[in-house]
Amino acid sequence: MLGRKIAGTCLRANVPSVAATSSTPATQTRNSHTIWYPDAKFERQFKTGGTLGKLWMSERVSDFDEKIGLDKLEKLAYSDPVMSDNYSGKQREKNLENMILNFGPQHPAAHGVLRLVLKLEGEVIIKAIPHIGLLHRATEKLIEHKTYTQALPYFDRLDYVSMMCNEQAWSLAVEKLLGIDIPTRAKYIRTLMGELTRIQNHIMGITTHALDVGAMTPFFWMFEEREKLFEFSERVSGARMHANYVRPGGVAWDLPIGLMDDIYDWAIKFPERIDELEDMLTENRIWKARTIDIGLVSAADALNWGFSGVMVRGSGIKQDVRKTEPYDAYADMEFDVPIGTKGDCYDRYLCRIEEMRQSLNIVHQCLNKMPAGEIKVDDHKVVPPKRAEMKENMESLIHHFKFFTEGFQVPPGATYVPIEAPKGEFGVYLVADGTGKPYRCFIRAPGFAHLAAIHDVCYMSLIADIVAVIGTMDIVFGEVDR
């Protein structure tokens, strides 16, 4: 108040002349241009005061106050307080504008065409909205206009990191509707190639996850091994990636001579590569800081969100289609299903590492137990005849022509066949109407359910952690958008 009085005595002499010369009306609109009033920063210094009136309004109105308009300001302050809800000392929070950030689709960590709209409060994510459909190619609709054989290559292009596993799901669904059982050798070949594909996928998943959070070396070291797996795929099918190898009724070709020996030589050396990968990451304090307690998913949430694969096993649930509903040769295989305890990114990383070791175990069993025999069913309505037979037998030529022009008829019915793809439960729901083309094909992609829950997994995480979460989900947009 002392400062107030001094200011008053200094200004008193000038007030009449100002009032006389000014053409401003007596009632002033209170705004930032006419009269000063406390802002949030000023009020924070006097938090105990709580209201504008308590801060700087005098108890009685003096003639000086009336002359410079402070009495009117006082009434305004009490009728419309600036920063207070009441006069109990509670302050009204200042409204903060949250930042809306587009993450992707051209972000290097977006794993393809992922677009996330992030709502940020500082660096904390309070909302994450995935925008899908940028890689939509109407696969399910196209399959309705193709024969059962022509539909197969579309599955290579869904999850384009684990191709032969997708083919397996389609072939098993068609075989189930046809009611056929394929030869044992074909089952073992499918299982062998499926596990090599699983290792190929996990190499990609783990190393790109590490690359996203800043570790480049694992990516370059492990891709040499992935290249060797591509070579095996090329030797067995002629194509490095989109193999079109696992077909309804068996597999397209038998294993070439020498391939099993080469796979064995690779399989006994590969554990050393896994050890090198673990040396770089598992006890690395930076890697642990970026993955432990990040992307936590409880067991109940994992089930409620429809998670599968590593995403559900990392939370401690022992769920694996190869164990619960064995297909092909998995009933004859002995292997363990690794599970996590906490459900964070680090647990899921350890699960993938151990899954690669278990896949190698299955590969060795397939190589040791591989039976001799046929690789396709002996039914030329489902499987085309050999070229040698076509040149000698008229019926074989007719079967060949009918197979590649009209395809084979599947009895009416519907089925759902799940398999344990590297990313989770990949399922095919197939409806047949008795013609040579499917009536409806629905593809259950594991990544779709994982991406749908990204808001809940990332809520209140830092923006840097969303990169780690996307990496641990191992999302590929071919299967999400379809």
Swiss-Prot record:
Cofactor binding notes: Binds 1 [4Fe-4S] cluster.
EC category name: translocase
GO molecular function, one term: 4 iron, 4 sulfur cluster binding
Residues binding [4Fe-4S] cluster: C345, C351, C366
Signal peptide positions on this chain: none
GO biological process, any: mitochondrial electron transport, NADH to ubiquinone
Cofactors: [4Fe-4S] cluster
Alphabetized Gene3D superfamilies for the sequence: Cytochrome-c3 Hydrogenase, chain B (1.10.645.10)
Record key words, sorted: 4Fe-4S, Electron transport, Iron, Iron-sulfur, Membrane, Metal-binding, Mitochondrion, Mitochondrion inner membrane, NAD, Oxidoreductase, Respiratory chain, Transit peptide, Translocase, Transport, Ubiquinone
Topology within the bilayer: Peripheral membrane protein
InterPro entries per record: NADH_Q_OxRdtase_suD, NADH_UbQ_OxRdtase_49kDa_CS, NDH1_su_D/H, NiFe-Hase_large
Source taxon at top rank: Eukaryota
Localization per record: Mitochondrion inner membrane
Catalytic activity: a ubiquinone + NADH + 5 H(+)(in) = a ubiquinol + NAD(+) + 4 H(+)(out)
Principal cellular location given in the protein's record: mitochondrion
Any one Gene Ontology cellular component term annotated for this protein: respiratory chain complex I
Keyword Electron transport: yes
EC number: 7.1.1.2
Physiological role: Core subunit of the mitochondrial membrane respiratory chain NADH dehydrogenase (Complex I) that is believed to belong to the minimal assembly required for catalysis. Complex I functions in the transfer of electrons from NADH to the respiratory chain. The immediate electron acceptor for the enzyme is believed to be ubiquinone.
Xref: PANTHER family: NADH DEHYDROGENASE [UBIQUINONE] IRON-SULFUR PROTEIN 2, MITOCHONDRIAL (PTHR11993:SF10), NADH-UBIQUINONE OXIDOREDUCTASE 49 KDA SUBUNIT (PTHR11993)
Subunit relationships: Complex I is composed of 45 different subunits. Component of the iron-sulfur (IP) fragment of the enzyme.
Family: Belongs to the complex I 49 kDa subunit family.
Protein's name in the database: Probable NADH dehydrogenase [ubiquinone] iron-sulfur protein 2, mitochondrial
Organism per entry: Caenorhabditis elegans
Lineage summary: Eukaryota, Metazoa, Ecdysozoa, Nematoda, Chromadorea
